[in-house]
A protein has these predicted regions:
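Extracellular/lumenal mature domains of secreted and surface-exposed proteins
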Residues: 8, 16-126
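Bacterial N-terminal signal peptides that target proteins for export
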Residues: 2-13
Length: 126
């Protein structure tokens, strides 16, 4: 009987830890259950005739997540230039020899995270 009582008490203690682990502190509106790292990366740049560069940007999540959507702001003006999409990769045409900061936002449910990448575009020969 002692073993049964201990087992029941252990179950209650464990349940209490789970509830405490998920409780939202007063004044906060969001709980982070897992830590996720978002990274924006320039995957490729290619001159596209004249003074334009076709830039491929991608976002990665570590650890990988399902049911997320990505949105890109190509010039860091605070306005996202793409609709939400499950595809983390986009292409955009920039002028050559330009310093650029692009921002990616990842959304999962009501949670979101952002990251930016700053880079210089290639010099294209006319």
């Amino acid at each position: 009987m002692k073993n049964n009582l201990w087992f029941k008490l252990s179950g209650v203690a464990l349940l209490g830890l789970v509830v405490l682990g998920l409780a939202v502190p007063r004044g906060q509106t969001e709980t982070t259950v897992t830590s996720v790292t978002l990274a924006a990366v320039v995957q490729d740049q290619q001159c596209q005739g004249g003074d334009n560069v076709n830039v491929t940007l991608t976002a990665t999540l570590n650890p990988p997540q399902q049911n997320v959507q990505f949105q890109w702001d190509f010039n860091n003006d605070g306005i996202f230039d793409t609709p939400l999409s499950p595809n983390p990769m986009v292409t955009h045409v920039y002028p050559d020899e330009t310093n650029v900061t692009a921002v990616v936002k990842v959304v999962k449910g009501r949670r979101s995270a952002t990251d930016s990448v700053t880079f210089s575009t290639l010099r294209c020969e006319n």
